[in-house]
Amino acid sequence: MKKFIAAAALFLMSLSFGDKLSAGNFGILGGANFCTTSMAGIKSESMTQWHAGLSYKMNLPLGFHIQPTLLYNVKGSDFNLSETDFTVGYLEFMASVQWGIDLILFRPFLDVSPYVGYGVNHEGDLSVAWKEFGNPLGYGVGVGGGLDIWRFQLVARYNWDFGQIFKPDQSVSPVIGARFRGVTLSLAYFF
């Protein structure tokens, strides 16, 4: 009888603490991008776009979390060249490394997120130029912070693209070295 009661108590304890001891959680996320483009001699303004995707948050010791994410991320910019705009939709993989202090009700954290992506579509006035001279491979790093509250996660991050938007070509010299950069705000829900 004692063994049965001990086994039942252990089973009930495992049910109540199972969520905290799990290896990780799947989640969905979405948010807004406030992107601009750096081009030599051409002024660009921020353009608001969006991103959405799937994520998995792995819990590690000492307050660390690793959060691989697959997302569709639309980046763009408005140029002061007679109302010219340009957007590229990237399929990106991001490996976010987070460190924060668990304060029971919430967890503030710092975030470093290297990413790599592939441009799958493009729109706007520079679309024809991107089709011919565009560099579909994009990569960079994001740095920011966030807050976990229950199953929700809010993250603000500044992203630097290291890859050029256009391939180096002398016929399109104004766009050589053009890169996206900007702020992303994301809200995630983990199951």
Predicted features along the sequence, with ranges:
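Short N-terminal segments immediately surrounding and downstream of signal-peptide cleavage
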Residues: K20-M39
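Flexible, solvent-exposed loop segments that connect beta-strands
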Residues: F34-S44, V74-Y90, Y118-L137, Q164-V183
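Gram-negative (and chloroplast) outer-membrane scaffold detector with strong preference
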Residues: G24, A32, S55-D125, S186-F191
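Predominantly the C-terminal beta-signal and adjacent terminal strand-loop region
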Residues: H65-N80, V141-F191
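Generic detector of contiguous secondary-structure segments
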Residues: L15, L54-N59, L81, G138-L147
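Hydrophobic, lipid-facing positions within transmembrane beta-strands of outer-membrane proteins
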Residues: F26, T48-L54, L91-A95, V112, ...
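Cleavable N-terminal export/targeting peptides
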Residues: M1-N25
